[in-house]
Amino acid sequence: MTKNVHHFLAFDVGEKRIGVAQADSEVRMPFTVGTISVDSLEMSRVRELLAEVRPSIVVIGLPRNQRGETTAQTAVSQAFGDKVAALGVEVMVQFVGEALQ
């Protein structure tokens, strides 16, 4: 019996850099891929990573403040997710809350 293994690519969007991690449903242990500079070439690098990893799901962290409210960075992360979805690559984009506590 063949097992379906899902590959995940995760992005943590910051002001100057985007942290990138990779995981799969079999090993279930994420590991750091590296960082991408936030600049005019960021989406080219994201496209390269999508082609290399071929994830079934892209996970993007959505930061929240201590009260669980959205912040300016939340909007930046959501916009990044929209750009990933617009690349035309068949991948599900999911947002995951990152609440400061």
Model feature map: region roles:
Residues 2-11, 15-101:
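Phosphate- and other anionic-substrate recognition elements at nucleic-acid/protein interfaces
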